Regions:
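Generic serine detector
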Residues: 2, 28, 42, 98, ...
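Short glycine-rich substrate-engagement loop in P-loop NTPases that contacts/grips substrate
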Residues: 1-7
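Charged catalytic carboxylate motif
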Residues: 6, 59, 142-145
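Residue-level signal for the nucleotide or nucleotide-sugar donor/cofactor binding architecture
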Residues: 2, 55, 138
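Residue-level recognition of oxygen-bearing side chains
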Residues: 6, 119, 138
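Conserved catalytic-core segment of NTP-binding enzymes
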Residues: 9-118
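C-terminal boundary of histidine-terminating zinc-finger modules
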Residues: 123-145
Length: 145
């Protein structure tokens, strides 16, 4: 067993009990992310509406391609989701435009944009989902879309 397949082997026993298994990874390309990509059927790529996360998309796409070639040929990219976006700012609008221009022909860019809101950080700090913490807020409504 290779270390990149550890999570896939563990989840194989659980798959029969669930319709979906969500694997939420930190924004890094370490071993946990590689394991998640190797185990996943598909991936939704969240991208913060900032310059550096947008630049990181290039490396992530290369990593996903490598995982598809070497570990998980069935891995699909379901789409890219813009997060932490304050669409009143030029930066957020430019980030969205760049995503659509550079990746939109090959990868679905979701129309839904997750807005920046303090309630998202507060819900994490409280150990609650955004639906438990602020079910009628803008972030919860955006994720529900």
């Amino acid at each position: 067993m290779s270390r990149e397949q550890t999570l896939k082997l563990y989840l194989a026993d659980l798959k029969k009990d669930y319709d979906y298994i969500l694997i939420d990874c930190m924004p890094s390309l370490g071993m946990l992310t590689i394991n998640a990509l190797a185990a996943a059927d598909s991936v939704i790529v969240p991208v913060q509406a900032h310059y550096l996360p947008l630049k990181g998309m290039t490396q992530l796409m290369k990593t996903i391609g490598k995982v598809q070639r070497q570990l998980n040929p069935n891995l699909k990219i379901d789409g890219v989701l813009l997060t932490l976006a304050d669409m009143r700012t030029k930066l957020a609008k430019t980030t969205e435009d760049s995503l659509r221009e550079n990746y939109g022909k090959h990868i679905r860019i979701f129309k839904t944009v997750i807005p920046v809101a303090i309630t998202a950080a507060e819900s994490s700090a409280a150990g609650q989902s955004i639906y438990e913490y602020d079910k009628n807020g803008t972030v919860a409504k955006a994720y529900a879309e």
